[in-house]
Amino acid sequence: MDGQTLRKAERSWSCSREKKEGYAKDMVTDFDEKHDEYLILLQQRNRILKHLKSKDPVQLRLEHLEQGFSVYVNGANSELKSSPRKAIHSDFSRSASHTEGTHDYGRRTLFREAEEALRRSSRTAPSKVQRRGWHQKSVQIRTEAGPRLHIEPPVDYSDDFELCGDVTLQANNTSEDRPQELRRSLELSVNLQRKQKDCSSDEYDSIEEDILSEPEPEDPALVGHPRHDRPPSSGDWTQKDVHGEQETEGRSSPGPDTLVVLEFNPASKSHKRERNLSAKRKDNAEVFVPTKPEPNLTPQAPAVFPDQERMCSRPGSRRERPLSATRKTLCEAEYPEEDASAVLQAIQVENAALQRALLSRKAEQPASPLQDAEGPPAKPWTSLLEEKEETLELLPITTATTTQEPAGAAGGARAINQAMDRIGLLGSRQQQKLLKVLQAVESDSAHLGRVVSPTKEQVSDTEDKQRMRADEIKDAIYVTMEILSNWGNSWWVGLTEVEFFDLNDTKLYVSPHDVDIRNTATPGELGRLVNRNLAGKKDSSPWTCPFHPPLQLFFVIRNTRQLGDFHLAKIKVRNYWTADGDLDIGAKNVKLYVNRNLIFNGKLDKGDREAPADHSILVDQKNEKSEQLEEAMNAHSEESKGTHEMAGASGDKELGLGCSPPAETLADAKLSSQGNVSGKRKNSTNCRKDSLSQLEEYLRLSAVPTSMGDMPSAPATSPPVKCPPVHEEPSLIQQLENLMGRKICEPPGKTPSWLQPSPTGKDRKQGGRKPKPLWLSPEKPLAWKGRLPSDDVIGEGPGETEARDKGLRHEPGWGTSRSVNTKERPQRATTKVHSDDSDIFNQPPNRERPASGRRGSRKDAGSSSHGDDQPASREDTWSSRTPSRSRWRSEQEHTLHESWSSLSAFDRSHRGRISNTELPGDILDELLQQKSSRHSDLPPSKKGEQPGLSRGQDGYSGETDAGGDFKIPVLPYGQRLVIDIKSTWGDRHYVGLNGIEIFSSKGEPVQISNIKADPPDINILPAYGKDPRVVTNLIDGVNRTQDDMHVWLAPFTRGRSHSITIDFTHPCHVALIRIWNYNKSRIHSFRGVKDITMLLDTQCIFEGEIAKASGTLAGAPEHFGDTILFTTDDDILEAIFYSDEMFDLDVGSLDSLQDEEAMRRPSTADGEGDERPFTQAGLGADERIPELELPSSSPVPQVTTPEPGIYHGICLQLNFTASWGDLHYLGLTGLEVVGKEGQALPIHLHQISASPRDLNELPEYSDDSRALDKLIDGTNITMEDEHMWLIPFSPGLDHVVTIRLDRAESIAGLRFWNYNKSPEDTYRGAKIVHVSLDGLCVSPPEGFLIRKGPGNCHFDFAQEILFVDYLRAQLLPQPARRLDMRSLECASMDYEAPLMPCGFIFQFQLLTSWGDPYYIGLTGLELYDERGEKIPLSENNIAAFPDSVNSLEGVGGDVRTPDKLIDQVNDTSDGRHMWLAPILPGLVNRVYVIFDLPTTVSMIKLWNYAKTPHRGVKEFGLLVDDLLVYNGILAMVSHLVGGILPTCEPTVPYHTILFTEDRDIRHQEKHTTISNQAEDQDVQMMNENQIITNAKRKQSVVDPALRPKTCISEKETRRRRC
């Protein structure tokens, strides 16, 4: 017995010594001490576990939300996989079934559970700092549709580069020798284990395992290496190479279903190692930079995480092993210089192995999904291989070819040793199972290598062919026209039109936005060069610009339909021609370049008087193709170099972040003949690829044979017509059938549309309807729904198709910017993927967008190409947390574009109006260009809808989805319009409209001969008979109303026909249709129409949704319905603008509307009843009060004289009865008596007397100079009182001046210069004078009114009172005044003025100009009297101060004097018909309109200075006899062509100040009334309750010495009185 015991002890000692040598660990420990320590540790762990398992309600709720079906927008669980479901902790349960001892099981399980609990307690999502209670592990769910989804957290991009050092040392572990070495080592380990089994009894088995598994602090395998060189942690050894990276992302193994994880359950030894490996790096944990990540080549040592602090305490005799989280500093020298072909070869090898394994797994996969969850024994070796490879996918391809390097070999050997260390700790059963797996791997590795390993030369050749093929699909063609001379005009050059045709002789659309010019400061209207006949027959004038040879015109013809054979075949140039123009302006010698190739160098014909000269230029295809090939080769060379540098230096930072395949970067590498899926095996960087099970599910759904690479590579030629038949381009449903393999609708031999080639690196748009979420559509494979013709090269399999979709088309219409320069396309394709191609929320891209109530979900601009069951790629995750500036700007511009309601339906010509704040070829351009020529599934709608956008409102009929070729026609022609109403906005019983407006291509309202409806109106119901809401109300012109007398209402029955038929008087081209929806009230607005179809002479011209009215009278026009445009011709739109009554309506014009009907809340209890509720038309009293007219005053009996207004006499007496306000003094500056011929009669001092005579009659005055003789001294325009007459004034008494002529004279009137000493003293001037001649009163009973002096000498302020003028005023009838009980003041009026001000002097104070600090001017002005008639003005009526530029020193003879303001030549840019004056320091420029009689003005028209618009008036005020009646801003003259919306105002020739309430005048001047609402808004900025005051920059004082000289002196100025 003792001998046997001794032999066992010796054998145990020998085994212990061998293991101590193999693993460099000291295993000699006393059993009793070890057992006691284990019990203590077990108690401590149990306490910790109990504490950790107790969760508060917040943690429970977080766990429920974060581990369930919730997919958060922050990226925590956004990636989906379809791997078979496994239990997350199935390794624990499997550990319990092992035959090891109870102590070993309990210890192992507790350690693992405690470790998991500690890990969970230190997590936070989704950033680097983990949230408590959030353990970011893989989650497996099963949807209602059946497929399983594997959701796992994303890999963080920013930390990938830090692992490059590790990966360089560990990349060789993937070689074919590794399974062999590992198997040999494992056989040795198994034999050793068997010896150990033989040496010890069953009782001591678990004890010895415990002894062997307890490490010592001096473990050389751990202490001697940094973090990345440590032995593997718990979990499968195959994860060792990437475990640090996975922990960086807060995630465990790649998938809980991995066989190695389930089988290689660690012993207790792995606890500390697991702690070391799971101590998450915290470098930059608090910093999150939402921009494009840059590789950190020298990462700092990470900080210690709380996991390290929470380690359970050990007995005092034990020493804690230090945690080392320090990472090896990376050095650029570690990266070998590799060729891009080597990278591609490595990708081919991986892809081939992956495809082979996947197909084998698919063939042997168990039928029952539950069988997969039972465990590894049920899986074939191919499944094990797949799962094994899945754990190695994060190794970068850039280091896959470094097996020759000694460092790589050493790293591989070290990895094998470390794996054996881990395997040695396993039980014998586990080691035996692993050995079987490795034998199976080794036996088939050679076969896989023979099948899938191409040579470098083959890969390189394939790469060149692929690049050439991909580049055959062009983004755009660039045409340059160089004009060297014209036919003789020395100043101008012009062209009528330039047209481009493709190989099918189809005219190619060119946006005006894509036309540019160089070498001229004034480009002219470049949009006139292209698409002149697009919108209508009426063409604008030809394009002209100043000629400074050589002049270069640039055209960009975009491949909007992504045709594979997109080439330019012919260019037609139409030279300058007008019927009466100078044909010498036409271009003569020109050069034409197509993509930098000269195709034409010659003369263009000169047009004759009958027709323009057309010149067709054929494009040589050889030049174009050779240049294209050259570009492709250059791009290939540069790309290879760039790939070589990026792979070696920056950890393939620019290779699409692993989510965009190298196939994309290297011109879309296609599948080999064996069908390897290079697109799926796309991970050439340090980030994770999608799971194999997802690809398997993807291939299963698509049902496409793997030999797709053998398909013919010729691209399908798209037909030239705009709307090809359905059979030529399959719809989305047909594409889906192709992918499913159920039905093939395409002709035999035709390449499927989803495999048609398209340009590299360019976003694709989708026109399909968005699919429902996966859980709502169990029968449809949503991974393929909604895709357009793919951008894949012919021959790609579905896996590569998916990969390219993810790399290129994550959010088409919002992300990637297109490279305009073809030469830069390959390089830009690599950088745009991770910076721009991102979904802002990283949700499943096919998510449903919420309906807005007005518009349905947009299924184009916001949709993506991969389905809900496809996991989002890594760039999605990163970009979702780093929104890029470019995508944000494109979103902003997209929102701006949507706000262009009415014009956006036809964006082809209006796209250039949007501010070009993005780089050329930005995403907005691409969005618009794509949709201008593409087939859209649903008809492009009216305003607010982009062409090609389809709307997915719930109630919308999807009948047009199958057709997919409807587009709103341009200017449809016909005579009968039928509006078919499909649905309402919610009312189940009634449907109604407020009005319908139709405009023709002439800009005029269409004359309607008949209108009828079916059903006609609600009078067909039994309870009605005389309801006023009939169909004829739709065309009565009253649309913005809530009055029942002007609306139409009819019964509505779901499923039946409801239509309105309108017959035009004459057939015409329809340019605009406006639908005013039912607007009775907010509640009743749900009776408005929703989905309609319009037919014009049986041609469908519109199908879509009409916006619901607001139910109020306030708001913008789009709040009342919708406007549908059928043209974008600027001339037609401007003509419509001027005849459109909609823009006349404002709050002031709504006074004729009825009060809103008193709303009775409808009953809600009969929601399911079929009984139609009763509706009653409002019968409120009419608010309009009849306008009364005052009878005109009877004329005063006229005094009979031989000549009216001419009186003869000798003694003239003037009696002054009132002053302008002074109660003590009255005075005058000068007086003249006007003779019959208008001359001043001579008056001498002895002929004139006064009573009182002067101030000297007062006691306090004795020698005052203001005597009577000053009235006739001839000095009248003055402010010196020694030239004025002043007398004491007593109200109510007579103050008489008597003039006795030497003989009888014919007197026509008087001329006064009132008292003008100062502005304050002007109130001493005379106001009322009664005149008599020889005792006969010749003045009106109230006397003559004398104008008050101005108080300055800015103009000759003489007032000429002619007797005849007063006789005419008495004979003319007074205008009728309207008595109205309510105010008619318009809400848009920006001033409160007396109605029709009356006065003598209308003074315009010009406060500022539009920018010129030295000059200010006007072109013209007109004043209208109370009857709306223009007041004739002469030079005596107009004056200015300063007078003109002639007032400047050294300037004389300038013709821009004030009289030009009234020369009737106003709509001009000729400076000879304008007024210009200098701006002098300290002075306000003034323009005076002076009248001798009180004049009532109803309207003033102003023409701003047009010659130099910045010298025009900006801020000004209007004073009438020194009373301010208006101030505002006069718009600067603009030569731009306007539009129809308020956001793009048309060119207004003049601006109007309205004082009248006459509706006719207001209607006539509706477009020119000055409105300053925007400028009058006062905005106050606040920040944290603090008012922010932006200190305005002090305006610098203008130096008069720097004033530029200006003078126009073509004709002599006429003499003026002042």
Curated annotation (Swiss-Prot):
The keyword Transferase does not apply. Keywords: Cell projection, Ciliopathy, Coiled coil, Cytoplasm, Cytoskeleton, Joubert syndrome, Phosphoprotein. GO terms for biological process: cerebrospinal fluid circulation. The modification Phosphoserine is found at S453, S660, S691. GO terms for cellular component: centriolar satellite; ciliary basal body; cilium; cytoplasm; extracellular space; nucleoplasm; plasma membrane. Residues 238-250, 801-812, 821-837, 858-878, 888-897, 934-945 have a biased composition (Basic and acidic residues). PANTHER family: KATANIN-INTERACTING PROTEIN. This is Katanin-interacting protein. It comes from Homo sapiens (Human). The lineage of its organism: Eukaryota, Metazoa, Chordata, Craniata, Vertebrata.
